[in-house]
């Protein structure tokens, strides 16, 4: 323990007490946890003293030492069988390790201690996530997964961040499907940053399927109108005229189900999937059925006189431009792709515009050289 703490201290930020002072106080508190004859160790008191020492070290910007104190607090809470306190201490230790990593990278312009604080933070947060799941708190576990994923992405590790975004989405899906789709979108963006285009295509395909499952609602037809009432007799209250009846009391045709925010997810997934398929250009033998169906929608044979029935949620202009792009890419028409890039630029996101640029580069330099 002492050697590990001293090793992490080398990557610490800011002034503070010497390693010997910290280790002396740390050992003094640790001695209270040793089992003695006819004397039970006071774990609760030791946990409080570890916490106090950690707060003092954090105030002095001795981040690694403060983090080690929080880990000691977590061990004390574990001995007391207090799961929430253990999870809280682990989370605080992880955040201190992340601060140490960020500060060292900002000051030294290089990874701190070869990423050891980042690995320690990931380990502590992973343990906290498992504790929250054991306590039946999936929302808290998902929040920690999102926090770790965002930190990894900001620290230049998008591939590792994508996995934690996907785990957060898995935890959020039963109760918060829209938040789960947002987390999957972040995972796909991280995979694009890591140039894992095949993985990003798989995530966008899953997003589209989940958005259809959770966002579409069956249209329920209105009940038939009641039979005409008999003519009122003398002294009876006259029936309301048709103009004063509620607007939904008639037999109007049902309106299509509105997808709301899910429609934006469907549009993003559809456009990104088409661009990724044009970029990857998988051979027919390796083309999955759902991907083949997507490309078939944009062939000229699929276009009918009724407009763009197969376009789904896409605006008509964007659908026609994507259809032209698919045909131009298949024909290797570089000039047509350049012209379409200008027209599609304001209709796409920055991420999608980058994919379109890669499609153009792949057309100019095929066989993966453009990517």
From Swiss-Prot:
Keywords: Acetylation, Cytoplasm, Endosome, Nucleus. It comes from the Eukaryota. RAB5A effector molecule that is involved in vesicular trafficking of early endosomes. Mediates the recruitment of HTT by RAB5A onto early endosomes. The HTT-F8A1/F8A2/F8A3-RAB5A complex stimulates early endosomal interaction with actin filaments and inhibits interaction with microtubules, leading to the reduction of endosome motility. Interacts with HTT (via C-terminus). Interacts with RAB5A. Found in a complex with F8A1/F8A2/F8A3, HTT and RAB5A; mediates the recruitment of HTT by RAB5A onto early endosomes. InterPro entries: F8A, TPR-like_helical_dom_sf. GO terms for biological process: negative regulation of proteasomal protein catabolic process; vesicle cytoskeletal trafficking. It comes from Homo sapiens (Human). It is linked to Up-regulated in brain tissue from patients affected by Huntington's disease (at protein level). In a Huntington's disease mouse model overexpression of F8A1/F8A2/F8A3 impairs proteasome activity leading to the accumulation of mutant HTT and causes defective mitochondrial functions. Gene3D superfamilies: Tetratricopeptide repeat domain. The modification N-acetylalanine is found at residue 2. Residues 221-235 have a biased composition (Pro residues). It is found in: Cytoplasm; Nucleus; Early endosome; Nucleus, Nuclear body. Residues 213-250 are annotated as: Disordered. This is 40-kDa huntingtin-associated protein. Residues 236-250 have a biased composition (Low complexity). Produced abundantly in a wide variety of cell types. Its main location: cytoplasm. One of its GO terms (cellular component) is nuclear body. The lineage of its organism: Eukaryota, Metazoa, Chordata, Craniata, Vertebrata. A motif (Nuclear localization signal) lies at residues 34-36.
């Amino acid at each position: 323990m002492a050697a590990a703490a001293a090793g992490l201290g080398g990557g610490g930020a800011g002034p503070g007490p010497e390693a010997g002072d910290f280790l002396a106080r740390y050992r003094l508190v640790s001695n209270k946890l040793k089992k003695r004859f006819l004397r039970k160790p006071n774990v609760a008191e030791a946990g409080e003293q570890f916490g106090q020492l950690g707060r003092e070290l954090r105030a002095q910007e001795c981040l690694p030492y403060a983090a080690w104190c929080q880990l000691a607090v977590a061990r004390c809470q574990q001995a007391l069988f207090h799961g929430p306190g253990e999870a809280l201490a682990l989370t605080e230790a992880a955040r201190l390790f992340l601060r140490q990593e960020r500060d060292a990278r900002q000051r030294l312009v290089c990874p701190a201690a070869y990423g050891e604080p980042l690995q320690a933070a990931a380990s502590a947060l992973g343990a906290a996530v498992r504790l929250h799941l054991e306590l039946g708190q999936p929302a808290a576990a998902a929040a920690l997964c999102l926090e770790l994923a965002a930190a990894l992405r900001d620290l230049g590790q998008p591939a590792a961040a994508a996995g934690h975004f996907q785990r957060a989405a898995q935890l959020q899906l039963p109760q918060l499907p829209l938040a789960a789709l947002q987390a999957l979108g972040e995972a796909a963006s991280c995979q694009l940053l890591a140039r894992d285009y095949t993985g990003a295509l798989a995530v966008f395909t899953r997003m589209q399927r989940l958005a259809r499952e959770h966002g579409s609602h069956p249209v329920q037809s209105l009940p038939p109108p009641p039979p005409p009432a008999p003519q009122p007799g003398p002294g009876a209250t006259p029936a309301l005229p048709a103009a004063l009846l509620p607007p939904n009391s008639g037999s109007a045709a049902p309106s299509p189900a509105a997808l709301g925010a899910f429609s934006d997810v469907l549009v993003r997934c559809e456009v990104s999937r088409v661009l990724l398929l044009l970029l990857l250009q998988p051979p027919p033998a390796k083309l999955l059925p759902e991907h083949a169906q997507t490309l078939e929608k944009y062939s000229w044979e699929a276009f009918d006189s009724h407009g763009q029935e197969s376009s789904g949620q896409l605006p008509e202009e964007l659908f026609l431009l994507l259809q032209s792009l698919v045909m131009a890419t298949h024909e290797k028409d570089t000039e047509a792709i350049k012209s379409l890039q200008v027209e599609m630029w304001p209709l796409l996101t920055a991420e999608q515009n980058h994919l379109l640029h890669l499609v153009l580069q792949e057309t100019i330099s095929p066989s993966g050289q453009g990517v």
